[in-house]
Each structure stands twice: as structure tokens, then as C-alpha cells.
Design a protein with these regions (language model features):
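Signature of the SF2 helicase/ATPase Hel1-core->accessory helical subdomain module
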Residues: 33-40, 63-64, 182-203, 207-444, ...
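Conserved SF1/SF2 helicase motif Ia
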Residues: 16, 35-60, 233-235, 645
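Pre-Walker A (Motif I) flank of P-loop NTPase domains
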Residues: 10-19, 45-49, 201-203, 526-527, ...
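Conserved motor-coupling elements within RecA-like helicase/translocase cores
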Residues: 188-203, 676-725, 737-740
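Pre-Walker A adenine-sensing motif
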Residues: 1-13, 32, 512-520
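Walker A/P-loop
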Residues: 12-34
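Conserved strand-helix element at the start of the C-terminal RecA-like helicase core
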Residues: 47-62, 627, 634-669
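A substrate-engagement module of RecA-like helicase motors
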Residues: 54-203, 285, 289-350, 357-369, ...
Length: 875
């Protein structure tokens, strides 16, 4: 594995390399060895290293320290390596101890500030409650913790950070700020609370995918996005559990997009006004030496001043064409329900209007000094009269502004670089873009919306000259790319309110980013190595679109040669050589048509069968057959575990978690069944069984996972027989469930890497469901779920697994569902049999089985039970 990674890094300046490495194959160990062996070699001396994974708790930062230490390089580890966490997480963990240690050094005006006091009070309250939890109130306590943490993350920490940034502004450059934090007593505590200030001093970084996408806030320079920043140029980036990071990126893209509710007309006006009226600083339009060289070599290119002038002309033309000096207002009689009207735009516009109206037109009323918005049944005769024409023009101008801002910013950065004095800090593209946008005095929300879009368009950065032409070809390829990955989508909606009664607000949510686009940014600047058991599994729902990435990266999409493939195959064969010593049993668990017939397979006592038939009939209605089937299959797996004296640990994975008194999957009822099964098993002579279902059943849920998992491992290490109930989402990718081998337990060593921990003895797998967002005809979905559904729908249309007609029909249904149009949805168009959905289910099953394949020590018997629906159709 190390040889394959080294060959990729030495043969490419940038690109993407996917490594399919099975769970338990030592992939993390090999990555850490690679970093520790190569960081100080001549060929890697200019490279930074990144290790990225979904779960922050799975970052092997302390393990890397051991790899450095065994080579005598512990000092280098402290000097060069850092784990970058969210600022709020660090503050929650450190603020109290740092305040105690540095209380005499922290300036009094900081300690006495409202921002510091509010933050300290919240952190103290949170930590006190966590240290002294109230027994039996775990669920309400968890909700309280989450509320306080979100308040710190969203309000208290940003306010305190703003205070510190203002404090450090007395030092004019990032370098001087960093020097003060490192050396001046009254500022050293800042480095303890915000270790990210030292990012530029390090070379090896460990961070979650969330942090990588959302960006780095260092206090000493503008916040930047890792994937567009020069920090990753020529870097080696390892992405652990590669395919699963797509869902994490998608989640953050959706969350960020839904946070920016953009008033399209207002944003246009706020950009147009300074373009028309303001005299911009001369430095903004002074061409840099690099720009002048480009102008000499390209006859059609324009100066910065000409670009700014063209931008003003384009905005003014649109402003005049649509009489934008007047407000836009919905004519009340044209629609009864304005809250249920949307315009969706991907490759083209699609209207989702209430009632029988299919079009929306704009009528200019010069007498009333008003632009009237009217819903109509007929398409307007003049194209310019359509609202779609207005919105298209406005969005095109905003995109033009993004492009021109990026061009001006890059020129300004080059100008600053050319004028830089000795020992002066670099002026970054982030500095330049922020400076350009600041000239337009935009609202904070507009700036936060535009900044990453402008930076994303400027992420090419400084590259080696001999690769510039090749990269330009890639950029040209992207400019013709019309896929959802590159262009994204957006949707518009309309709001009328008494507080803005003279005009209607036309808002949009914009999703121009995609996980594939982020990955392309990375692979254009760095050497990206994606590692997972299912890294190259072909599913656009559970993995990146590999066909698209290959098409866009071309030669930079690296595939290992035959020698490396054979070497990895031999390594894998060595890992599984001892499996022949095991007895592996697989079985599908079925369901019979009525409760009584199923219960006869579970119990032998006719009175118990009758009693529990009645309980099931009371718990499950005829309409809820799926829940009953799911429940009874779990009970059948439970019985098989109880009656097998060779099994001590069992993992039962379902689509949802069992909860007490939850009719569809009642934990209390499961424990009742367990108690009765234990009674009959003991009567049948089975030994070493728990007293009751309460002792046998262990529910592992997301809330309080770490504490529960530690308790579970301790009990299993003592030899207790435990049936663990959990869900696919809870266990997830990368969760470690192995536990220390109990005393006097006979285990089988399957390879030379076995240590002191063993895997579970058995597993039950329910057929994965809800892999696509569920559009329930009886319940509205959230805004974020609807956007996720649209992304999934667009991904499938992109690959040709769903027709445009069916896909757009589903998207329209999703909008109706969001706005409360329930009871109309038809599932006939949902692509249940498409390859991506099929492979997504396979991926979930492979990752689930991987939870019991992490170590070299196994029970002599391994039992794998599956929902019979998996046998029939995989999903």
C-alpha cells in the first residue's frame, strides 16, 4: 500500500488516486507510516500532509505521535503536526483551564467584556451539567447540552472571536500578530484557546471533513476554505472512508445553502448602485505586471478598468430593460396562495405554482410606478414580460459580478505582491476578494454568500508554469460542463408581508456547489488519495460520481499498475489466511403471513404464543405490516443468538433505533420477548445466560454513544452475553466495536496482526431502506431534506438512471410536499431498481459487516443473519 501511494505521489503533481482497502487491512497504519517515513525526505520537503475523515473522534492523531516517536522524531511531531478542531469545540474543552492558568496575564478589559463573561458562563454551565448528569433524564439532558453547545457555536464564540480579532488589529500583518501570540505574555493564552493561529507554522494536519469544507478561522488572517486555498497546493491529502465523505460534504453544502436566503432583486440593486455612482480606488483598476503581460499576449483581453466598466454597463442595461427603478409587487387577485409558489432552476426553469396557473409575468405600470407580478394560465407574448426572463438576467449579472470580482481580486493580489517590501507578509487571495467585496458595502449575509463563490472561481492559484496550459485546458473543459456537479441548481419563492406591503420579496436559495466540485478543486491543486473498502463502488448516491471525475481529471485520475494490484492482493490473502479455521454460518431470516405462525418459531408454550399474538396485534396495525415484519425478524435473530452457547456477542443492525414505548419498534417489548426466550432456553438446558431481557439487550444509540460504547466493551470483556441493538446511521463508517478478549475464552488467530481485541461473534442485517429521502404523502419534509432529495434526483438524472421527465416530476412533488400539498404524491417514478440505489445498499451492508471484521482474533464460530429481502433483491 505504501509503495502504491509513493508511486502515485512521485508520478503526479496533482490528481486523484482511489485505494480499495478492506476493513481491518491496516490502511490507517500504513498511511501514518507513510507520513512518518516521508515528511522529511527531499522529495516531500515542500509538501504538506492532510488526513481527513468523517468522524473527528476517529482521527489517529495520537497514533501518529507514536510513529514519530519510535523513529526518534517526537520533537518534529510537536513542531509540525496539529489537529484542527472547530473553534467552539476547543473553547468548550479548554476555556476554564486556560482562564485559571492565565488569569493574571489576560488583559482586564478582555476579562470584563460582556463577550468573555457570556462565553465563560455558558461553558461553565455546560461542563458542570455534563459532570453531574441527572440519572433517568439522559434524553432531556442531551437536548439541553445541544442547545448550549449550539448557542456557544452560533453566538457566544463568534462574538468573542470578533473581540479578539479587534484586539490583534493593532498588529498590522498576520506575521506580527502570530509573533505577539507566541512571545508576548498578555497574548499567549490566545494560542491555547485558538491553536488554529499556528496553522501556517505546521505541515501535517488532521481534521474532519466538516472542518475541511467549512474552513479555517485563524484570527490573524481572513477565514479561508481549505479546498480553494494555497495551503493545499502540492499537498498530499489522505481521505479516509473516501466514499462516505460525499454524504458529509453534501450535508454541509445543503446546510450552508439553506442559511443564505438571498433577495435577488435587492442584491442586484446593492451591486448596481456603487457601480453607477461610486468612484473606486485607483489600485482596484491598476493593472499588475502579470495582467499587462497577459494583455500583450491576448489581443481580446481587457484591462481591469475596462472590465469594471463593462460590468457597470451590463448591470445598467438589465436595470433599464426591466424598469428596476420601480418595486416589484404581486397583484393580489392573480393568486390566492403566494406561499406555495416556486420557480426551480437547474438547466432551465420549472414552475411549481398553486392552482391552475403555469406562468408568471411582469407588467410595468409607469403611472403607479410599480412592476406588477401576475400569475397567468397563458405564456406571455413578449419574452421580456416573463418573470423568468427577469430572474435569468438578474442571476446572470450576479454571476458576472462574481467573475469580475475574482478577476479584480487576483489582479490586486498580484499588484500587492509586486509592491511588497522585504519581510512583509503575503497578501492572500482571501484578503483580495474580501477587499473587493468590501468596496460594494454589501450586507453581511450577501458577503458570506458571495465570498466562497468568488474564491471557488479563483482556486487555480499559483501553479508551476509547465502545468499551466494543461490546467487551463481543464478549466476550459469545466466552462462547457453543464452537469449539476458544476452548475448546481437554485429555487425562487415569493414573500408578501405587511412590513413590506409596497413590494414583494423574491428570494432564492442557491446551491452552486457539489461534493464532486469540491473534490475537483482538491485534485487540481494536490495529490488526493481516497481510501475505503468501497472507494471505487459505482453509486452516485453513496459515492462520488467516478465517471464524472474521470472525465474531468483525465490523466490526473490515477489508476495503479498491475504490479501494485498484485502486491495488494497478496497482502489481502495474508489477512484472511486464517479464516479457513473458522466456521462461518449465514442464514436468511424469513417472515410468515400471520403473527401466530411466526411466534410458533420463537416459543413452544401455546399460552405464551397466544399472549404475545395479542400483544403484537395491539402494537401493530394492519396498515403497519412493514414494522411488524421488521420487529419479528429481530426477535427471530435474538432467539438464534440466545440458543447458541458458542456466541457471546451479537450486533443487530436496523434502519431505525428501538425506543421504549415506540409502537413501531418498542424496546420495552423487545426486552419482554427476550425474557420469555431466556426462560424457555434455560428450561431447554442452555447455560451461561443472563437473568432477564434487561441484562441481555443493550441499545447503542447516537446520544451518549462514547459512554455507552465504553460500558458495552467493558461488559463484553468480562464475558457477558449481550445482544446489541443499533442502527446503520448510529454505527456508521469507522466506528470501532472490537473489545478485549475475555479470560478463558477460546479465540482463533486469523493473521499475524492479531493483538488483544476481538470482533463480535455475529450480526443481523436488516435490508437498508430510505436511501433516498422519503417523500411521505402524509407528512411535510424539511427544507434541508427537500434539497437533499433534489440533489439525489439530479445525481440520478446526470447518470441516466432516471429520466428527465420522471426526475422533474419528482422534484415538483417534493416542492408541493414542502409547502403542505399532502396526500397527492405517487411513488411510481421513484427509481427503486436503479444501479446506484442497488449499489448504495450493497455499500451499507459491506460497511456494516466491516464492523465485525476489524481484528485478527475471532470467535471459532461467526454467524451472519440477513433479512430475507436482502437475499431476494439486496434492497
Amino acid at each position: 500500500m505504501k509503495e502504491a501511494m509513493d508511486k502515485f505521489c512521485k508520478s503526479r503533481d496533482n490528481g486523484l488516486f482511489l485505494l480499495d482497502m478492506t476493513t481491518g487491512s491496516g490502511k490507517t497504519f500504513n498511511v501514518l507510516e507513510f507520513i512518518a517515513e516521508n515528511y522529511n525526505k527531499e522529495e516531500y520537503k515542500d509538501s504538506k500532509f492532510f488526513f481527513i475523515t468523517n468522524l473527528k473522534k476517529n482521527l489517529p492523531f495520537d497514533e501518529l505521535r507514536k510513529h514519530f516517536s519510535k523513529r526518534g522524531n517526537a520533537g518534529d511531531f510537536d513542531k509540525l503536526c496539529m489537529q484542527i478542531d472547530a473553534n467552539a469545540d476547543v473553547l468548550i474543552h479548554r476555556l476554564q483551564s486556560v482562564y485559571t492558568a492565565y488569569q493574571e496575564d489576560i488583559p482586564k478589559h478582555i476579562i470584563q467584556s460582556p463577550e468573555f463573561k457570556a462565553l465563560l458562563n455558558s461553558v461553565q454551565l455546560l461542563n458542570k451539567q455534563k459532570r453531574n448528569p441527572i440519572e433517568g433524564k439522559e434524553e432531556s439532558a442531551s437536548a439541553f447540552y445541544k442547545y448550549i453547545e449550539n448557542d456557544i457555536r452560533d453566538k457566544k464564540e463568534p462574538a468573542f472571536r470578533k473581540l479578539l480579532i479587534a484586539e490583534l488589529n493593532s498588529f498590522k500583518t498576520p506575521g506580527k500578530k502570530l509573533k505577539a501570540i507566541a512571545n508576548e505574555k498578555k497574548y499567549q493564552w490566545i494560542g491555547e484557546l485558538y491553536p488554529a493561529v499556528f496553522t501556517r507554522e505546521k505541515r501535517i494536519y488532521f481534521l474532519s471533513m466538516d472542518k475541511f469544507f467549512l474552513g479555517n478561522t485563524t484570527l490573524i488572517e481572513p477565514q479561508y476554505l481549505f479546498y480553494t486555498h494555497k495551503i493545499i497546493e502540492n499537498a498530499v491529502i489522505f481521505i479516509d472512508e473516501f466514499d462516505s465523505t460525499k454524504s458529509r460534504l453534501l450535508q454541509q453544502i445543503i446546510k450552508v445553502g439553506c442559511e443564505h436566503k438571498i433577495n435577488s432583486i435587492d442584491l442586484f440593486t446593492k451591486i448596481h448602485s456603487p457601480l453607477k455612482l461610486k468612484e473606486f480606488p485607483l489600485d482596484l483598476t491598476t493593472d499588475s505586471h502579470s495582467t499587462r503581460q497577459y494583455l500583450e499576449q491576448n489581443s481580446g483581453a481587457k484591462t481591469c478598468a475596462a472590465n469594471l466598466e463593462d460590468l457597470e454597463k451590463a448591470f445598467s442595461k438589465t436595470h433599464d430593460n426591466f424598469s428596476m427603478q420601480y418595486s416589484f409587487r404581486t397583484r393580489e387577485e392573480s393568486t390566492k396562495d403566494k406561499s406555495r409558489n416556486f420557480l426551480f432552476q437547474d438547466l432551465q426553469f420549472h414552475s411549481i405554482f398553486s392552482g391552475d396557473k403555469s406562468f408568471m409575468q411582469v407588467k410595468v405600470d409607469h403611472k403607479a410606478k410599480q412592476n406588477w407580478l401576475e400569475f397567468t394560465q397563458e405564456k406571455p407574448e413578449k419574452e421580456d414580460a416573463e418573470l423568468i426572463s427577469l430572474l435569468s438576467a438578474v442571476k446572470a449579472r450576479i454571476s458576472y459580478f462574481q467573475y469580475t470580482s475574482g478577476t479584480l481580486a487576483r489582479n490586486y493580489m498580484q499588484l500587492k505582491e509586486e509592491r511588497k517590501k522585504e519581510r512583509e507578509d503575503d497578501f492572500t487571495i482571501e484578503n483580495a476578494v474580501a477587499s473587493v467585496l468590501n468596496e460594494f458595502h454589501l450586507d453581511k449575509d450577501y458577503t458570506q454568500y458571495l465570498l466562497p463563490l468568488v474564491l471557488s472561481g479563483q482556486s487555480l492559484g499559483k501553479r508551476k508554469k509547465d502545468h499551466q496550459n494543461n490546467l487551463q485546458e481543464k478549466e476550459n473543459l469545466r466552462s462547457f460542463e453543464r452537469s449539476v456537479y458544476e452548475r448546481g441548481f437554485r429555487y425562487y419563492f415569493f414573500e408578501d408581508d405587511l412590513n413590506h406591503n409596497l413590494n414583494s420579496q423574491i428570494y432564492f436559495y442557491d446551491f452552486q456547489n457539489s461534493p464532486e466540485k469540491v473534490l475537483l478543486h482538491m485534485a487540481k491543486k494536490a495529490k488526493v488519495i481516497g481510501i475505503s473498502a468501497t472507494a471505487s463502488l459505482d453509486t452516485v448516491l453513496g459515492n462520488y460520481d467516478l465517471e464524472y471525475l474521470q472525465r474531468m481529471l483525465q490523466a490526473e485520475y490515477y489508476e495503479m499498475d498491475e504490479a501494485d494490484q498484485k502486491r495488494l492482493e497478496r497482502h489481502f490473502e495474508g489477512l484472511i489466511e486464517g479464516y479457513q479455521k473458522l466456521k462461518i454460518h449465514t442464514e436468511a431470516i424469513s417472515y410468515k403471513e400471520n403473527f401466530m405462525d411466526n411466534l410458533k418459531e420463537i416459543f413452544s408454550n401455546p399460552h405464551i404464543i397466544q399472549e404475545y399474538t395479542e400483544k403484537l396485534e395491539n402494537s401493530f396495525s394492519k396498515e403497519n405490516k412493514y414494522a411488524a415484519v421488521s420487529f419479528l425478524r429481530v426477535i427471530k435473530a435474538l432467539k438464534k443468538f440466545v440458543y447458541n452457547e458458542n456466541l457471546r456477542s451479537f450486533l443487530c443492525l436496523n434502519n431505525k433505533l428501538a425506543q421504549e414505548d415506540k409502537a413501531s419498534f418498542d424496546l420495552k417489548l423487545i426486552k419482554e420477548f427476550a425474557t420469555e426466550i431466556l426462560k424457555e432456553a434455560k428450561m431447554a438446558g442452555k447455560k451461561l445466560l443472563p437473568k432477564a431481557g434487561e441484562d441481555l439487550i443493550f441499545c447503542l444509540r447516537t446520544e451518549g454513544y462514547e459512554q455507552s460504547n465504553a460500558e458495552l466493551k467493558e461488559r463484553l470483556s468480562k464475558g457477558e452475553k449481550i445482544f446489541v441493538l443499533s442502527s446503520y446511521n448510529t454505527i456508521g463508517v469507522g466506528q470501532n466495536l472490537q473489545y478485549k478478549v475475555p479470560e478463558n475464552l477460546e479465540v482463533v488467530k486469523i493473521n499475524q496482526y492479531a493483538q488483544e481485541e476481538k470482533d463480535f461473534d455475529g450480526i443481523y442485517l436488516e435490508a437498508p431502506t430510505h436511501l433516498i429521502v422519503n417523500l411521505d404523502m402524509n407528512n411535510s419534509i424539511s427544507e434541508e431534506d427537500m434539497v437533499k432529495f433534489i440533489f439525489q434526483d439530479e445525481f440520478l438524472m446526470e447518470r441516466g438512471e432516471l429520466s428527465r421527465i420522471d426526475g422533474l416530476a419528482l422534484i415538483k412533488e417534493a416542492f408541493r410536499n414542502l409547502s403542505g400539498g399532502l396526500g397527492r404524491f405517487s411513488k411510481k417514478n421513484i427509481p427503486h431498481d436503479c444501479p446506484s440505489l442497488h449499489n448504495y445498499a450493497i455499500k451499507n451492508l459491506l460497511q456494516a459487516v466491516g464492523r465485525i471484521c476489524r481484528t485478527g482474533l475471532k470467535n471459532k464460530e461467526i454467524h451472519v443473519y440477513v433479512d430475507e429481502d436482502i437475499s431476494e433483491n439486496t434492497i
